[in-house]
UniProtKB/Swiss-Prot annotation:
Location (main, coarse): membrane
HAMAP family the record matches: ATP_synth_epsil_bac
Protein name: ATP synthase epsilon chain
Family label: Belongs to the ATPase epsilon chain family.
Amino acid sequence: MSTLHVDIVSAEQAIHSGEAKMLVAPAREGDIGITPRHAPLLTKLRPGEVRVQDENGEERFFYVSGGIIEVQPHKVTVLADTAARARDLDEAAAQEAKRRAEEALANRKAGEDYSHVQAELAEAMAQLQTLERLRRRAKR
């Protein structure tokens, strides 16, 4: 079976580099699945989980806060604003960020711009969902 090379990088560091049978990523318009020989594509990512299935069928999970994904027939590059291995996420910090964002939205004043707070809430929720999916898969 053919594979594709996957690189997941953020501004801070390279998170993953290796061969894969498949990758699933949170594209702006919905999740996308990429397999070898996929048509070229360049699209934005929303906060969420990136799942990489390696040559042996083992899955690895990552969190991205957004960014872009570039797809070529045998190579995928995820350029994330922020990226982390799912197992390295801090659940307590994500819960606290969610609480603060919800509180700020509940106490907002008319005319103030809260788009940054909404973005922070979306990122915290995506981190928590990634952790929850990782826990569910670990129970299998």
